[in-house]
Amino acid sequence: MQTKARASSGTSGVTTGTPEGELTLAVGLKLRDALEARGVRVVMTRTSQNVDLSNVERAQLANQAGADLFIRIHADGSGDDSARGVHVLYPSSIEGWTDDIAAPSRRAAELALAALVAATGALDRGLDARQDMTGFNWSDVPVVLPEIGFMTNRDEDRLLSDSAYQDKIAQALADAALRFLQERAG
């Protein structure tokens, strides 16, 4: 049996050499700040690079916190260096596992994708319902995984390393999260 590393660095920027984990932490911290500035309580799965949490443990952390939304920021990589754009993954419905969070997760994914495309002008690569992701299948709370761009595309890699572009991503995700929370509150 083959298992995944508990914490992996993911892909790296083809031009910048920036590891995915470093990029996503920077965006995650900006997102935290944007949400906290609007009065939202945020629980982070990590605030530094020195973390050894599995995807199950990350989902359990969100569950234990009673999160209204679990946002798992990632960046994409591809063997095709022309691949570009953003897409958002969310859990498909699996009876007994994700059936109660699939619909709200899809709504949060729709909001996140629309906000990311509007804020950054990135190519809309759509939504992707998944049933093979541990971080989704162990989550008891709505969860989305925005892929914020392709680090294997020279142009997007440079953009993703730009602090002002990261601010746009963080603000877009904050706007989407707030709209999701408002919709859920009724």
What are the functions of these language-model segments?
Residues 1-59, 65, 92:
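Active-site histidine-acidic residue metal-binding/catalytic motifs
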Residues 2-16, 78-105, 109-111:
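A short, glycine/acidic-enriched catalytic loop
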Residues 18-26, 52-56, 99-107, 160-171:
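Soluble non-cytosolic domains of exported or imported proteins
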Residues 21, 38-41, 69, 84-86, ...:
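Envelope-exposed proteins and targeting segments
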Residues 29-41, 63-68, 75, 113-122, ...:
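Sec-exported extracytoplasmic/periplasmic mature domains
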Residues 55-68, 133-139:
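Mature extracellular/periplasmic domains of secretome proteins
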Residues 72-80, 89, 124-186:
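Active-site-adjacent mobile loop/cap segments within catalytic or ligand-binding domains
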Residues 103-132:
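Active-site-adjacent substrate-binding region
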